[in-house]
Amino acid sequence: TNHGFEQSVIPCGGEHYLATGDEWAEGSFEFCRDEADAIFMGAIGFPGAHLPNGDLAGGSVILGMRSGLDLYANVRPIRLYEGVPHKIHGKFTKVWDPDMVDMVILRENTEGLYHSLLHRSAQRAKGLEGYEPPAIEFPGLKGEVAYDPRPISSHGSERLIRMGFEICKTRKGAPVDAVSRVSCIDKSNVTRGCQLFRRSFDNVATQYPNINTDYGYIDAFTQWLTRTPEFYDVVVTSNMFGDIATDLASVLQGGMG
């Protein structure tokens, strides 16, 4: 029944934590890292399941592997298939021809706004002491202050962007014009991390002269994505922007999966 594959099941997640006090058994991370050829993961959250520090119970499973195994690229195809209604509005069962929605969005998966949580989860998955970001002063703020640093590196950006260009080489181009195009989506008019991401994009793009480049700010991109999805071929962006944009894009294809 497993089609020749050897299957190992690892109980884990929030419900498992409530029952056992552990997010998963000791040695599970090492097994996934050293023994598994592929990992298929179900939902890990459970209502009311949190660690003493407030983190989601089960986070060291999905987030720990994401950071601990350096799974840096979240590759999300967005495609509307024949006969599948999109979810833009219930009354509009068909706005685009299916062939007009066919793009791939690449989200950087280890840095950015989630970096502290990812690194903390990876440390926990390895049985090490949890990570906390260094203290930062914020002049002018009053009362309790919570913060999440948003580190973005040239190394992390360039390898994600390079994968985007390589994927673009394997595709037929954007649906509207068959042009091979990689779009850089950021907020480089505001944040330094995004300015570095865009510079990294420009550096990588010089190695792919036969692929067109495109730029957009994330706020404007959200309206372009739903208004003219046929323009997009491959999109590269940072962690949280990609998290939000791909959930939005899922309505173009009728759902998350």
Q: Can you annotate each of these PLM segments?
A:
Residues 1-2, 126-219:
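Glycine-rich phosphate/diphosphate-binding loop of Rossmann-like nucleotide-binding domains
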Residues 2-5, 34-38, 70-72, 93, ...:
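Short coil/turn connectors at secondary-structure junctions
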Residues 2-27, 225:
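N-terminal beta-loop-helix "entrance" segment that forms/cooperates
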Residues 2-4, 33-36, 65-69, 73, ...:
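Structural signal for hydrophobic packing residues in well-ordered secondary-structure cores
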Residues 12, 44, 80, 187-188, ...:
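Short, ordered loop/turn segments at secondary-structure junctions
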Residues 17-136, 146-147, 240-242:
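N-terminal glycine-rich phosphate/adenylate-binding segment common to multiple enzyme folds
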Residues 19-23, 190-201, 226-233, 250:
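Short glycine/threonine-rich loop-to-helix capping motif typified by GTGT followed
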Residues 31-48, 204-205, 210-257:
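Glycine-rich phosphate-binding loop
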